[in-house]
């Protein structure tokens, strides 16, 4: 079955280690191959069985089925490409859009050099790096949410409308409701 190692309590080295709370590897049953040689296959086969079982019992589609004869009105990338897509969509010059996309990793690489932090200082007290990270996260979320909206609402996220648009909407509703 397995190899079991019995401790020799007359061994002075083992007694000294046991007095310090060490020496646990001198006795007991080793994990390899006794335990792990049957735990690994059980876990792997169990994971495969659960995956196949869920796929058979609940076959849910991922997204809409593809229709090669109908092109969608607006083609959107996957959600994790939304900020990049929004940059390319809003910048009029495509070369400038590509340069802006390249400046994001270049700017991220320069953030650690903005502050002088010695090795004994708390790394969590870095106000410039923290501010740049928070602003970068907010801008990425703003660009990502804006990419899912139509182009005319993408920069304001549909939260703000100009007074002219609001007045025209009011006039249109007044016109149609006056005939009801």
Curated annotation (Swiss-Prot):
Organism per entry: Pinus thunbergii (Japanese black pine)
Superkingdom of origin: Eukaryota
Location (main, coarse): plastid
GO molecular function: electron transporter, transferring electrons within cytochrome b6/f complex of photosystem II activity; electron transporter, transferring electrons within the cyclic electron transport pathway of photosynthesis activity; oxidoreductase activity
Name of the protein described by the UniProt record: Cytochrome b6-f complex subunit 4
Family matches, as PANTHER family: CYTOCHROME B
Transmembrane domains' residue ranges: 36-56, 95-115, 131-151
Function: Component of the cytochrome b6-f complex, which mediates electron transfer between photosystem II (PSII) and photosystem I (PSI), cyclic electron flow around PSI, and state transitions.
Entry's localization field: Plastid, Chloroplast thylakoid membrane
Family listed: Belongs to the cytochrome b family. PetD subfamily.
Encoding gene, per UniProt annotation: petD
Family matches, as Pfam families: Cytochrom_B_C
């Amino acid at each position: 079955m397995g190899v079991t190692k019995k401790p020799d309590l007359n061994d002075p080295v083992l007694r000294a280690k046991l007095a310090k709370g060490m020496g646990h590897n001198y006795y007991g049953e080793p994990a390899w191959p006794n335990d792990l040689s049957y735990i690994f296959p059980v876990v792997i086969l169990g994971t495969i069985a659960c995956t196949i079982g869920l796929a058979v019992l609940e076959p849910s589609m991922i997204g809409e089925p593809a229709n090669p004869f109908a092109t969608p009105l607006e083609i959107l990338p996957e959600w994790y490409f939304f900020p990049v897509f929004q940059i390319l969509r809003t910048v009029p010059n495509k070369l400038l859009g590509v340069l802006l996309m390249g400046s994001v990793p270049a700017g991220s690489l320069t953030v650690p050099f903005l502050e002088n932090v010695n090795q004994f200082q708390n790394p969590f007290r870095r106000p410039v790096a923290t501010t740049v990270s928070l602003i970068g996260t907010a801008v990425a979320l703003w660009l990502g949410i804006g990419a899912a909206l139509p182009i005319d609402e993408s920069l304001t996220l549909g939260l703000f409308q100009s007074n002219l648009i609001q007045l025209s909407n009011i006039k249109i509703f007044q016109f149609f409701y006056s005939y009801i």
